[in-house]
Regions:
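Ferredoxin-type iron-sulfur electron-transfer modules and their immediate structural context
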Residues: 191-193, 220, 234-357, 405
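Hydrophobic alpha-helical membrane-insertion segments
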Residues: 83-95, 164-188
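Juxtamembrane inter-helical linkers in multi-pass membrane proteins
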Residues: 38-63, 149-163, 191-204, 246-274, ...
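Iron-sulfur-cluster electron-transfer modules
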Residues: 2-139, 146, 281-290, 312-316, ...
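Iron-sulfur cluster-binding electron-transfer modules in prokaryotic oxidoreductases
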Residues: 202-217, 264-274, 373-676
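Alpha-helical membrane-embedded segments
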Residues: 18-27, 133-137, 169-171, 216-253
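Membrane-interfacial helical/loop segments at transmembrane boundaries in membrane proteins
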Residues: 1-4, 103-121, 182-218
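Juxtamembrane/interface segments at transmembrane-helix termini
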Residues: 27-46, 101-106, 139-157, 178-193, ...
Length: 676
């Protein structure tokens, strides 16, 4: 845009840079006091390792809009609009440096930045882009405030901030076009006078009788209007959710690079406070999450707890924590030992919502700005259990059983080896040199329905002539339920006991049928020094099938809808192997659970310790998932997890369809297809 003339005797560039300096001063003051100072109250955290990997991810997430666009393949095209606005905004930011600030200092375009041809091309691009963005902004307004999809229907997502920003950006686009138009109308020449839309409008204004003097005045008005909007935007950002434009790239850089399924390790010996009960107990990355949050509602819209009528809203957890931090910000210092504790679980975040979380990771998967909700929620759950001894009664019963019996199945009548009766399965005590440890797990060993899964696995291993053994009575719970229910202390006791036992037998390779055991041993035992090669059965059996070690031959005539376990799929990226096993079964027709499959799979309701925590609000999560299964019209829902088998079977039974539909582990169907 061609700048107007000087302001009387005052050179234009002086006015521009004085106003810019003032706006930047206000921005930096607010940014420090409303963001930096508050975030630095948090505890130190990792995030400075593997810089190239971090930078690559941050660029893809922020500049590339990777997570925003990932939903397009599922038919959600809102991300295209957001990415267009974002990339357009970046383009205009570049143009401000060239056309507004640098040009105002020279009274014309600084030729050393671009050649005349470059200016012409770039001006045409900005002219067309301004029109495109104006259309996209109208669509964004209609979508958010008229059509209003479910994820944008919250008071938080309909806040006036978003409307103000849309109006400001629209003002930038219109003022760009009109500045060009009135430059043409006053007889201006050069590359900026040749832009398509601006030239057409300028000629139209001339035809309407707008004179050179009026056009000159209006060109100055819209040029200054454009600059004013830029300055207002600069000052306004630190006070709104649009701080995420600056916080999101930083947040993405410092995202966790640890396995998705691993909760952060707690050093019990050197930790004064267990979990997080006030702002200062969180890490600075967890506090930064609140500023990175775009309040888009994607996390809450994906949350199975929220979708079934529970209190939990991941978006509100993050935003309420940030708002609480800002509200008490006048007390905050980097080392605030003197600050009176202000509990976040008293009126800020409800305890019920903390216990609603299933640890399924759907919120993290959907978040476009690398907010990590689950560790934050789990730190509050740890605080409730370890600092305040608070938990639902059903959770307390399971934790007590874990502590007393080494498993959560209170009241079971089975021993660790009853499931193997008649199968002649050796223990490591009997066969210490076995190549593979088959980790049975509490549920397949001690819960009647799930014992069929363990038996199927043993039959398949024998058919493939795998050199394996089990721990038998030496096996105890991996500790996953304890950790997911907030008792980190009990988790570490159980985990260390298992690590010591396996190291005593020099175990190298572990195969398990339970994704929760798999995730814990693979991703969390290394935190305690337990380093083993851990495979889920689907990975191991898929290899056996490909090598020809087992050959399914019996026709099964089953139409199976496959349900992805959260701890196998989202947390560990194991999607293809279970499907590979299913496809190898003769006569099995595999179908997907609509759009709720793979990384967008819907939790069965058992994660986060909820296998043993009773649901008291809304629809049961497993019933909602059962409804999704029934929509496929398959006769069987296939899973790769003993928890999922139980939850889906109960859902089918609750709907009175257990004579028509069934829930089975893929492993069971595979075993039935073998000639044993």
């Amino acid at each position: 845009m061609v700048p107007p003339g000087d302001i009387g005797a005052l050179p234009l560039w002086v006015g521009v840079f004085v106003l810019l300096g003032l706006a930047l001063a206000i921005f930096h003051y607010a940014f420090y006091h409303r963001v930096v100072r508050l975030v630095l109250q948090g505890k130190k955290t990792a995030g400075f390792d593997r810089p190239l990997e971090r930078l690559k991810g941050a660029l893809l997430i922020s500049l590339g809009q990777q997570k925003v666009l990932q939903r397009v393949k599922y038919g959600d095209y809102a991300g295209i609009g957001h990415a267009t606005i974002f990339w357009g905004f970046l383009t205009f930011m570049l143009s401000y440096g060239i056309f507004v600030f640098a040009a105002s200092a020279k009274g014309g375009f600084p030729e050393w930045l671009l050649t005349e041809t470059g200016v012409r091309v770039y001006s045409q691009y900005l002219d067309i882009l301004a029109a495109v963005l104006a259309v996209v902004l109208v669509w964004a307004f209609v979508r958010r405030w008229v059509l209003t999809p479910s994820r944008l229907a919250f008071d938080l997502t309909r806040h006036s901030d978003a409307l103000i920003i849309v109006v400001l950006i629209m003002g930038l686009m219109l003022s760009t076009i009109l500045t060009h138009a009135f430059w043409v109308a006053q007889g201006g020449t050069g590359p900026e006078a040749d832009v398509f839309i601006g030239k057409a409008l300028g000629e139209l204004f001339t035809d309407w009788g707008i004179g050179v003097s009026a056009a000159n005045t209006l060109q100055g008005v819209f040029w200054w209007s454009h600059l004013s909007i830029i300055l207002i935007f600069t000052v306004y950002i630190p006070f709104t959710k649009h701080m995420h434009m600056f916080a999101a790239p930083v947040n993405a850089y410092f995202r966790s690079l640890e396995p998705k399924g691993a909760l952060p390790f707690m050093d019990l010996e050197n930790t004064e406070k267990f979990g997080a009960g006030r702002v200062q107990d969180f890490t600075w990355k967890q506090l930064l999450d609140g500023y990175a949050c775009a309040v888009c509602g994607r996390c809450t819209d994906a949350c199975p707890a929220n979708l079934t009528g529970k209190q939990l809203s991941p978006m509100h957890i993050v935003e309420n924590l940030k708002d609480h931090m800002v509200a008490i910000g006048h007390q905050g210092e980097r080392n605030p030992e003197h600050v009176e504790p202000l509990p976040i679980l008293e009126g800020v975040i409800s305890e019920t919502s903390i216990w609603d979380c299933l640890n399924c990771g759907a919120c993290i998967e959907e978040c476009p700005v690398a907010v990590e909700h689950v560790p934050t929620i789990m730190d509050m759950r740890r605080h409730l259990v370890l600092e305040e001894s608070k938990a639902p009664e059903s959770a307390m019963n399971a934790l007590l059983s874990l502590e007393q019996r080494g498993h959560p199945w209170r009241g079971t009548q089975y021993s660790r080896t009853d499931w193997a009766e008649g199968l002649e399965v050796p223990t490591l005590a009997e066969k210490p040199d076995a190549e593979v440890l088959f980790w049975v797990g509490c549920t397949p060993a001690l819960e009647q329905r799930s014992q069929a899964i363990a038996r199927s696995m043993a039959k398949i291993l024998k058919a493939a002539k795998v050199d394996f053994a089990i721990l038998g009575d030496e096996e105890t719970c991996t500790g996953d339920p304890a950790r997911r229910m907030g008792n980190e202390y009990l988790f570490q006791i159980l985990a260390q006991q298992n690590i010591d036992t396996m190291n005593g037998y020099n175990v190298k390779k572990v195969v398990t049928t339970c994704p929760h055991c798999f995730n814990t041993m693979k991703n969390e035992y290394p935190q305690l020094g337990g380093k083993f090669e851990v495979l889920h059965y689907s990975q191991f059996v898929d290899q056996l099938i490909k090598k020809g070690s087992i050959k399914p031959v019996k026709m099964m005539n089953v139409t199976m809808a496959y349900h992805d376990s959260c701890f196998l799929g989202r947390h560990n990226g194991v999607y293809d192997e279970p499907r590979g096993v299913a496809k190898a079964i003769p006569g099995l027709k595999l179908v997907e659970m609509g759009s709720r499959c793979r990384e967008r799979g819907f939790c069965c309701g058992a994660g986060g310790g909820h296998m043993w925590i009773e649901e008291s609000q809304g629809t049961r999560v497993n019933h909602a998932r059962t409804d999704q299964f029934l929509e496929t019209e398959a006769d069987t829902v296939g899973v790769s997890c003993p928890f999922c088998v139980q939850m889906m079977a109960e859902g089918i039974q609750a709907k009175g369809l257990d004579s028509e539909k069934e829930a089975k582990d893929v492993l069971e169907i595979l075993a039935d297809s073998l000639e044993l």
